[in-house]
Curated annotation (Swiss-Prot):
Keywords: Magnesium, Metal-binding, Transferase. CDD domains: Cis_IPPS (cd00475). This is Isoprenyl transferase. GO terms for molecular function: ditrans,polycis-undecaprenyl-diphosphate synthase [(2E,6E)-farnesyl-diphosphate specific] activity; magnesium ion binding. The active site is at residues 12, 60. The gene is uppS. Substrate binds at residues 13-17, 25, 29, 57-59, 61, 63, 180, 186-188.
Length: 244
């Protein structure tokens, strides 16, 4: 079975999971953290080398202040409680997103996680925090424009590859598979550049219910697809009339 090296997940449905059980939204987010732990443990066993998770979008700041505060607290708790285990398990942590507007203590924790695990190789866990695909593209364009204005690069020499090299995901391969839970059918501003040719799998379960079997199910779905990258599939090639 063909296994994608890089799987990205939109972890959606924490609030609805909690509401369906008559629980506060925070309970859903806490259950979501536990689902993340299980997924991180399962990923290397299933042959995944890179796992990117949409933890907090740049649009999430518009949520009620109490919920934002709860989410920040859960991030701090996750890193403080789980970082040692991640490191011992050989997991490398990478953070993508705009760190400029984050509190100093959160920035420090994110940097600590990256620094401590920088040499690990069993799995790269990419946490998208204060991340938005459009924002990432705009920030990259600004960096390149500034470099061109300083004469450091020739604007005419910018290519898709050189632009990608300026993204937050520099050095990380594009995801072959993007999974979204909760039944919603959209990308929600997630990895807009990187997911250009990704296979998309939408699962009806809410994120707190996501399990190893759900991940394996998505991998089986991926293995059954033919990736064309804008070209012809094998059946299309086989059905073309022979030249003569």
């Amino acid at each position: 079975m063909t296994t994608p090296a890089h799987v990205a997940i939109i972890m959606d449905g924490n609030g609805r999971w909690a509401k369906a059980r008559g629980m506060p939204r925070l309970a859903g987010h806490r259950a979501g953290v536990e689902a993340l732990r299980k997924t991180v443990r399962a990923a290397p066993d299933l042959g995944i080398s890179f796992l990117t998770v949409y933890a907090f979008s740049s649009e999430n700041w518009s949520r009620p202040k109490a919920e934002v505060s709860d989410l920040m607290g859960l991030l701090k708790l996750f890193i403080r409680r789980d970082l040692a285990e991640l490191h011992q398990s050989g997991v490398r942590v990478r953070i993508i997103g705009d760190r400029a507007g984050l509190q100093a203590d959160i920035r420090g924790l994110l940097e600590e996680a990256e620094s401590l695990t920088a040499r690990n190789e069993s799995l790269t866990l990419v946490i998208a925090f204060n991340y938005g695909g459009r924002d990432e593209i705009v920030r990259t364009a600004r960096k390149l424009a500034s470099a061109a204005a300083r004469g450091e690069i020739d604007a005419e020499s910018i290519t898709a590859d050189s632009f990608a090299g300026g993204l937050d995901t520099q050095g990380i391969p594009d995801p072959e598979l993007v999974i979204r839970t909760s039944g919603e059918l959209r990308l929600s501003n997630f990895l807009l550049w990187q997911a250009a040719y990704s296979e998309l799998v939408f699962l009806p379960c809410y994120w707190p219910d996501f399990s190893r079997e759900h991940l394996a199910e998505a991998l089986r779905e991926f293995a059954g697809r033919e990736r064309r990258f804008g070209g012809l599939g094998q059946q299309d090639v086989a059905s073309r009339p022979a030249a003569g």
